[in-house]
């Protein structure tokens, strides 16, 4: 499992240096089992996030992998998809062990594995402190293919021989920095000693302090290193407005009026559902507006083509769903319209935020019905920002 990795000496400021740059930007081209791919899409994923594009393939190929990424980047699904791809559902023994620093995170990971593996006939058991030891023993004797747990309870179950390690192929450490800082180092080292020599190790961590690097040096063989830098999104420099719309049905006319008032160089309009995107595209096209639409029902080829046209400026208005907000590089977009306010406030910054280093100016206009007022207030509070009523001279601001 281990030989000292020379490359780790280059580390500065707790950041690893990537040594692997291949990316795969669609789930369809990862050669996943059909029933796993079905689970990925059923879970709501449309397109792999940055870490998923880079880390899933090396893990599936069997490399030891160190991935440095913040939470919220899609790392749970990264190792869940990889684990599910590699295990044999017909073998009723633990083939993958996932460690997490807290019970809550372990349970959350279990839910993701179960949901994505929904069509695969795979069992995943959460082995965590604070629950009945007897229940754990019983569940482990049934031979779940994936066990996710906290170091203390997992170590206990391996020592008592209820969690058998002889069929284990993969060992995943999630939030390794957290686990080590919580004093689990000894138990983690003990677990390593009890695993087969050939076990593949995958380690995920937001930071890379010395104790995490020691684990990688001791227990990982020539690891692939992937650093996903945190994209700092900011609302600075973006003027945010709302237009009060009395009822949902009036939004379309409001949008048409806005078109008349404003010369739009490029705009993205966000709706909350794919159906709404298609509906709005049809309505605007019928009113002789040129728009393109993009959502997850389209295949990757179509989406790439639409993005290319949009980036080159040959299409000026793009109507899209949230799931693509993170994938759209809207640096050149002067206007973002939230036809629907996002269903969760985190997506607001992905729709209208900009990479701070670009410092581009922009305008965001939110269509707000009476039902949306509460959500808008929540967004303002969450981001400590102000969304003001749109002034008459909005055209001068864009």
Swiss-Prot record:
<protein>
    <recommendedName>
        <fullName>ATP-dependent RNA helicase eIF4A</fullName>
        <ecNumber>3.6.4.13</ecNumber>
    </recommendedName>
</protein>
<feature type="short sequence motif" description="DEAD box">
    <location>
        <begin position="174"/>
        <end position="177"/>
    </location>
</feature>
<dbReference type="InterPro" id="IPR027417">
    <property type="entry name" value="P-loop_NTPase"/>
</dbReference>
<keyword id="KW-0963">Cytoplasm</keyword>
<comment type="function">
    <text>ATP-dependent RNA helicase which is a subunit of the eIF4F complex involved in cap recognition and is required for mRNA binding to ribosome. In the current model of translation initiation, eIF4A unwinds RNA secondary structures in the 5'-UTR of mRNAs which is necessary to allow efficient binding of the small ribosomal subunit, and subsequent scanning for the initiator codon.</text>
</comment>
<dbReference type="GO" id="GO:0016887">
    <property type="term" value="F:ATP hydrolysis activity"/>
</dbReference>
<dbReference type="InterPro" id="IPR044728">
    <property type="entry name" value="EIF4A_DEADc"/>
</dbReference>
<keyword id="KW-0648">Protein biosynthesis</keyword>
<keyword id="KW-0547">Nucleotide-binding</keyword>
<feature type="domain" description="Helicase C-terminal">
    <location>
        <begin position="237"/>
        <end position="398"/>
    </location>
</feature>
<feature type="binding site">
    <location>
        <begin position="69"/>
        <end position="76"/>
    </location>
    <ligand>
        <name>ATP</name>
    </ligand>
</feature>
<dbReference type="InterPro" id="IPR001650">
    <property type="entry name" value="Helicase_C-like"/>
</dbReference>
<keyword id="KW-0378">Hydrolase</keyword>
<dbReference type="GO" id="GO:0005524">
    <property type="term" value="F:ATP binding"/>
</dbReference>
<dbReference type="GO" id="GO:0003723">
    <property type="term" value="F:RNA binding"/>
</dbReference>
<dbReference type="Pfam" id="PF00271">
    <property type="entry name" value="Helicase_C"/>
</dbReference>
<dbReference type="InterPro" id="IPR000629">
    <property type="entry name" value="RNA-helicase_DEAD-box_CS"/>
</dbReference>
<keyword id="KW-0067">ATP-binding</keyword>
<dbReference type="GO" id="GO:0003724">
    <property type="term" value="F:RNA helicase activity"/>
</dbReference>
<keyword id="KW-0347">Helicase</keyword>
<comment type="similarity">
    <text>Belongs to the DEAD box helicase family. eIF4A subfamily.</text>
</comment>
<keyword id="KW-0396">Initiation factor</keyword>
<dbReference type="GO" id="GO:0002183">
    <property type="term" value="P:cytoplasmic translational initiation"/>
</dbReference>
<dbReference type="InterPro" id="IPR014014">
    <property type="entry name" value="RNA_helicase_DEAD_Q_motif"/>
</dbReference>
<dbReference type="InterPro" id="IPR014001">
    <property type="entry name" value="Helicase_ATP-bd"/>
</dbReference>
<feature type="short sequence motif" description="Q motif">
    <location>
        <begin position="25"/>
        <end position="53"/>
    </location>
</feature>
<dbReference type="Pfam" id="PF00270">
    <property type="entry name" value="DEAD"/>
</dbReference>
<keyword id="KW-0694">RNA-binding</keyword>
<dbReference type="GO" id="GO:0010494">
    <property type="term" value="C:cytoplasmic stress granule"/>
</dbReference>
<dbReference type="GO" id="GO:0003743">
    <property type="term" value="F:translation initiation factor activity"/>
</dbReference>
<comment type="subunit">
    <text>Component of the eIF4F complex, which composition varies with external and internal environmental conditions. It is composed of at least eIF4A, eIF4E and eIF4G.</text>
</comment>
<dbReference type="InterPro" id="IPR011545">
    <property type="entry name" value="DEAD/DEAH_box_helicase_dom"/>
</dbReference>
<feature type="domain" description="Helicase ATP-binding">
    <location>
        <begin position="56"/>
        <end position="226"/>
    </location>
</feature>
């Amino acid at each position: 499992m281990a030989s000292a990795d020379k490359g780790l000496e280059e580390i500065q400021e707790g950041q690893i240096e990537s040594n692997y740059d291949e990316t795969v930007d669609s789930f369809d081209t990862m050669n996943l089992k059909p029933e796993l791919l079905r689970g990925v899409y059923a879970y709501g994923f449309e397109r792999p996030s940055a870490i998923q594009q880079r880390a899933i393939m090396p893990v599936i190929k069997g490399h030891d992998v160190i991935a440095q990424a913040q939470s919220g980047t899609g790392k749970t699904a990264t190792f869940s998809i990889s684990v599910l791809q590699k295990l044999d559902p017909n073998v009723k023994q633990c083939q993958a062990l996932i460690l997490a620093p807290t019970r809550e995170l372990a349970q959350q990971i279990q839910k993701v594995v179960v949901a994505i593996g929904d069509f695969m006939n795979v069992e995943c058991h959460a082995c965590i402190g604070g629950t009945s030891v007897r229940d754990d023993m019983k569940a482990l004797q049934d031979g779940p293919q994936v066990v996710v747990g906290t170091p203390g309870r997992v170590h206990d179950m391996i020592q008592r021989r209820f969690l058998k390690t002889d069929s284990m192929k993969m060992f995943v450490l999630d939030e390794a920095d957290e686990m080590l800082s919580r004093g689990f180092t000894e138990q983690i080292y003990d677990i390593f000693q009890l695993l087969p020599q050939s076990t593949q190790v995958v380690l995920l961590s937001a930071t890379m302090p010395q104790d995490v690097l020691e684990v990688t040096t001791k227990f990982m063989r020539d690891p692939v290193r992937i650093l996903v830098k945190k994209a700092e999104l900011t609302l600075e420099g973006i003027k945010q407005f709302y237009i009060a719309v009395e009822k949902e049905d009036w939004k379309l006319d409001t949008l048409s009026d806005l078109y008349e008032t404003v010369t739009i160089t490029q705009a993205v309009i966000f709706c909350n559902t794919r159906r709404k995107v298609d509906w709005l595209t049809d309505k605007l096209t019928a009113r002789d507006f040129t728009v393109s639409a993009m959502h997850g029902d389209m295949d990757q080829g179509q989406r790439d083509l639409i993005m290319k046209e949009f980036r080159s400026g040959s299409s000026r208005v793009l109507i899209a769903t949230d799931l693509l907000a993170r994938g759209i590089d809207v640096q050149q977009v002067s206007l973002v319209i939230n036809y629907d306010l996002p269903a969760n406030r985190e997506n607001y910054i992905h729709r209208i935020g900009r990479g701070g280093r670009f410092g581009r100016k922009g305008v965001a206009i939110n269509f707000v019905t009476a039902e949306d007022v509460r959500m808008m207030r929540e967004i303002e509070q969450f981001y400590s920002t102000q969304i003001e009523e749109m002034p008459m001279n909005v055209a001068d601001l864009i």
